[in-house]
Structures are given as structure tokens and as C-alpha cells.
Amino acid sequence: MSRLHHQQGGQPSQRMLRVAELVRHAMSELLTRSDINDPALEGKVITVPDVRMSPDLKLATVYVMPLGGENVTEVLAALDRHKKLLRGEIARRVSLRFAPDVRFKADPGFEYSGKIDALLSSPKVKQDLEVQDLELKDSGCAGAPAKTGPAGDGE
């Protein structure tokens, strides 16, 4: 093949992004309706923040996270057990030549946001933010630009 499936820079193609979004919607609807009878999934709200497709559209990597981030490995194992059922349901909802094989992974964004929150609440960062607030108050800037009229006369 002379053409690459990826755009320059390793970015996914528009088709890959479009199919990934269709699969994400179908998967989140399936997990919301709770058609899966598994004790590990009962009463859990599972979010599907991202799906990434392979260039040939035959593999969908579904990133999931249970609400609250609890029992992630248990939820991933339960979804893997019902992979065949979920693949069949996706095939019915998304019209593709081949139903993509489904792989489940924990969403790394949840862990990343936790690290950012911990960093922002650290004593050093709080101290720096307090210093910035004091400097703004001392300089008379409230952080918002002054309103001026069209002639710049304050009205």
C-alpha cells in the first residue's frame, strides 16, 4: 500500500476517529443499560472516556473507568469475560465490514488528574499561590481588566 492510514505525525485518520467515536457511544450505551449479568459490574457506573481504533479498524481499545475509580482490575476482568457479547452488540449498532475486536484498558486520565490535584494541594504550591494573591492585591489589580468605553474614558 502506498498510502499510510495515519496522517503525518502519527495522528489517527478522520475515519479512525469517527469509528472510534461510534464505538465509544455504542459501548457506553451498552454499559449504561446493564445488559451484562456479572456481580463485578452490578451497581457500578462505568464511564467510557476514550476509544482508539487500529488503522485497519479491526481492533478497538476501549478505555474505561468505574465511577470513583474503585475496583478497576475487577471491572476490567469482568468486561474481558463478556468481550464476545459486547463485540456482537457493537457489530449490531455500528455498521462496519468487520466487527472490531475489543480490548479494555483502565483510563490513564483518571490517575493523571489525581496527580495534578495532589500537586496543586501540596504546601509549596499553596504557598506560591498565596504569594501571587498578595502581590495582586498590593498592586491594585483584582485580576480583571478595567472596563472602558469606546473613547477609553471609563464609561
Swiss-Prot record:
Q: What does the entry list under GO cellular component?
A: cytosol
* Record keywords, A-Z: Cytoplasm, Ribosome biogenesis
SUPFAM superfamilies per record: Ribosome-binding factor A, RbfA
GO terms classed as biological process: maturation of SSU-rRNA
> Superkingdom, according to UniProt?
Bacteria
Major localization class:
cytoplasm
Q: Tell where it localizes.
A: Cytoplasm
Q: Name one GO molecular function term.
A: ribosomal small subunit binding
Family, similarity comment: Belongs to the RbfA family.
Partners and quaternary state? Answer: Monomer. Binds 30S ribosomal subunits, but not 50S ribosomal subunits or 70S ribosomes.
Protein name as it appears in the record: Ribosome-binding factor A
Species of the source: Methylocella silvestris (strain DSM 15510 / CIP 108128 / LMG 27833 / NCIMB 13906 / BL2)
